[in-house]
Amino acid sequence: MTTERMKITVVGLGAVGGLIAAKLALAGHEVSALARGANLKAVQEQGLRLRMDGTEQTATIAASDDAHALGTQELMVIALKGQALPDITPTLAPLIGPDTLVLPAMNGVPWWFLRTPALSQRLAPEQQQLTSVDPSGAIDQALPLQQVLGLSLIHI
């Protein structure tokens, strides 16, 4: 993995995901997005527009509703509402390789919360799945915990 120019995909192009994707693309990274609906169509047709401090910039990024089209990434930023994650997680496999880092940019209690070293040492394995967040275990199965950048704060 390089620290100069990374291959990054942002999952979800709402306000948070769009801002992160635009900033990373404008900084020179190879950015793509997994999106849907009106946001996907707008980015495909017009690029990703960022209005800040009285100026507007347009970032050109690849955007698709199909993870296969985007391929394996160095970094995957998940910028979704927490309740959307269980449904989309099974579709993310094409984005994740053995060296892909996963950065959750989400609010709420993360699915991996009970697996942190401080808690996992005190809980039996069957107590470590946060069923209120990941009822079926699909998120835990799809996103390798050792590749998740946990306890993340994103400063923009």
What are the functions of these language-model segments?
Residues M1-T2, H155-I156:
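Short, intrinsically disordered or compositionally biased N-terminal tails of bacterial proteins
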Residues V10, L40, E45-G47, T58-I61, ...:
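Generic secondary-structure boundary/loop-capping signal
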Residues Q57, D65-I154:
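Rossmann-like NAD(P)(H) cofactor-binding subdomain of soluble oxidoreductases
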Residues G17, T55-E56, A62:
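Short leucine-rich amphipathic alpha-helices used at interfaces
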Residues T2-M52:
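NAD(P)+-binding Rossmann beta1-loop-alpha1 motif at the extreme N-terminus of oxidoreductases
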Residues R5, G28-E30, T60, D99, ...:
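A generic structural signal for alpha->beta connector loops
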